[in-house]
Amino acid sequence: PPPPPPELAVDTTNRPDKLVEKLEQLKPGGGGALYDAIYMACTRRSLMKGEPIEPRRVLIIMGDGTDTASEHTLEEVLELAQRNLVTIYGVSTVAYGFGSTGEANLIRLAEETGGRVEYPLEGVYKDITGYISKPSDEGNYAIKVGTGGYATELAKSLFESVAAIAGEITTQYILRYVPKNTDSPKAFRKL
């Protein structure tokens, strides 16, 4: 059976507890309609009270960039995000030493909308493979099985990646200009 269509779990909010609650309910799984989810995020968004008419829009994608079931294409969602001034950031779930067919899509989505991709799992798995290939008393016990250390390292890496993105978002400025050539007013122009 095809995967279910994307659903809006939490609309625009200034309550982080609502986001955390939904994030805790997420389950990892294979396959999905990433581009359809981006399309929905770019088109279905409520304004909050006191928010400017054209607020800053940021989308953080946590995953490997693979899309297996979308009705929309990568090109469609890129154009939509660019026209709606949506900056896309990625938090890659690809582990150190592994690849993903969707990784190029995640990079493209981020770079072509002014964002970037974080790789939180690289450091965790790099350290673990380092401990295995260069055994030492200290290294062998760095992430001890059954202690929760591994899960803690994963959570810490993911948190640090999202915090780095949040820090970058809060220290950016938006510049706009009115083009002289108005033949194609909806065309995205790169500065």
Put a short name on every predicted segment.
Residues 1-191:
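Scaffold/interface architecture of coatomer-like assemblies
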